[in-house]
Amino acid sequence: MSDPAYAIQVALVGRLVALATEAGQRVYDDVPSEEQRTSDTGEAWPYISLGNGQMVPVDEECFDRSSTYIDVNVWSRDIGFPQVKRIAGAIRAALHEKELAIAGHVLDRMRVENIAYSRDPDGVTRRARLELLVETQPAI
């Protein structure tokens, strides 16, 4: 079985950057410091980060399939939740039941399973966490 997680991440980053949301080019796996984000892009907030994930093999007799879960997080310091909700909505519209070219794999289905909104313990930062399910099989 070929683990599609990295190929999915590469494809997702490309799609998220191309969306041109309020987060702009600030799409990260390993989030740089606030100072570095500002230096690189002119602003530190909002940004998108790829978070926790899990790959579950789906062993079938006739083919090899995977269900990959990945969290896509939206972070904002705007007052209230409007900004994270706008960005999360744009992400859902771009990913839910849409096509995505994943190197070495065939996409069977991609779904945003849920979106959770929360206030960070610092009392200032807002977060939207989208749980994405990507079902794939190796390209033959």
Region locations from a protein language model:
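Conserved acidic
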Residues: 4, 8, 83, 124
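Short beta-turn/strand-loop junction motif enriched in small, turn-promoting residues
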Residues: 55-58, 77, 117-118
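Oligomerization/assembly interface segments of phage tail-like spikes and tubes
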Residues: 64-78, 126-137
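Mid-chain, well-packed structural core segment of small domains
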Residues: 76-97
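Short, solvent-exposed beta-strand/turn "edge" segments of beta-rich domains on protein surfaces
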Residues: 59-65, 120-125
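Small/polar-rich, solvent-exposed N-terminal microdomains that initiate assembly or binding
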Residues: 1-60, 98, 102-103
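Acidic-leaning, charged glycine-interspersed low-complexity segments
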Residues: 18, 22, 93-140
